[in-house]
Amino acid sequence: HIIKKVLVGSREDESMVSKKTVAVIFGGQSSEHEVSRTSAVMMLQALDKEKYQVLSVGITKKGQWLIYNGPVEHVKTGEWEKFGTPVSLSPDATKKCFLKIVGGNVKEIPVDVVIPVLHGAWGEDGTIQGLLEMAQIPYVGRAGICRFYG
């Protein structure tokens, strides 16, 4: 596996004043949507909230991207969808952000690294990695080149 920039605990990270923003992307349109949510819960619980600002970004079975800020347990049950706010990944490599849409207004939400926790199609085939590479957003996992192997 080729690993992109990964945020790991180090003295350099601890000395930084602001927290790095880590986005966990889960769900998706594949038949493994529920498995992805279960994996995301484990990842969200494992991330150190004192070191990182954690964003939960879920993709519904219909393909809608939502940012969710509620209890992690709702990710596993699927209740997160009721409380999510529409969000998109900006393809603009100079921004490195999500775009949150509220009341017709667009707010940029900067992100330092993405942890894609998508299973099946669009998650394990290199699609999400390719999207992140186009936006030049660092991510954890295999490089998009894996989509060329089959």
Residue ranges of predicted features:
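ATP-binding N-terminal substructure of ATP-dependent carboxylate-amine bond-forming enzymes
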Residues: I2-I3, R11-G150
